Amino acid sequence: MTSSLVLALVSGLAAACFVDPGSGSGGATGDATGGTGTTSPTSDADASSGGTTGMTVTTTVDPVTSSDGSTGGCEGMCCGDGTVDVNEQCDDGNKVDDDFCAASCVRVAYRVFVTKQGSVLSGGLTEADEVCHAAAAAAGLPGVYRAWLSTSTVSAKDRVTHKQALPIRRLDNQTVVMSAADLVSGSLLAPIAVSEAGELLPLMPACTEESAVWTGTLANGEPNADTNCGDWTTTMGGGGAAGFLANADASWTDAGCAVACGASLHLYCFEVDP
């Protein structure tokens, strides 16, 4: 009787201490989200070690995004990428404030230069503008440029206009005029004697190929109609009105001389709005 009671007690204790690994894996799961990721702990029972339980933690981190929705670096329309987008006044590909285009892609000033090399014109205003464009591109200058040049029906002052009344500067940052309207005032703050390469050209006597600039334009910005080499379409006969690059008075655009149409003269190239 006593032996039977003891056997029953031992069997009961053994049953109470037994745990089925398949039903008691201790598999607790959790989910913490706070903008940086999700952590999910899981348990892994190793049957070979007698039911010893280990913990594996898996973490997922969300990618860091910028205010424009990109995931590092600039994507799409960005100030400073060298391309003028619809929401920008200019974009010279840098983040420098002390130049013609501020770091915020807001225009500060317009550029002007005189071509280093002379040109014999026979293709009208289109050819002259192409000369300016090619010179600027070769020098790595951004923007759109037009030649200060008049024909019998088109005035230079109407070709060089700006949406904003901002200074016009040489490439050495010297201000030429405070706005395009001042180009017909009869004087400049500084002569347009710096080339697309930023070099000050040698100051030679007026009305020579070394110092003369094709303009066909009077001091008031209107055409000098009698001396424009057939609206800059011929290199034969006659002469074209020229300016003097060394001067800041009215002779910068009208030096009072007509140079042979076949001559190779400089051009004034002004940056304009795209």
Regions found by a protein language model. Give the residues of each.
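N-terminal targeting leaders of exported, membrane, and organelle-targeted proteins
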Residues: S11, F18-P21, V108-Y110, P274
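Functionally engaged cysteine thiol sites
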Residues: C17, S25, T29, C79, ...
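Cysteine-rich modules of extracellular adhesion/ECM and protease-associated proteins
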Residues: M55-V57, V64, G72-V108
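Secreted/extracellular ectodomain signature
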Residues: V106-P274
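Ser/Thr-rich, Pro/Gly/Ala-heavy low-complexity intrinsically disordered linkers and tails
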Residues: L13-C79
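Sec-dependent bacterial lipoprotein signal peptides
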Residues: M1-A15
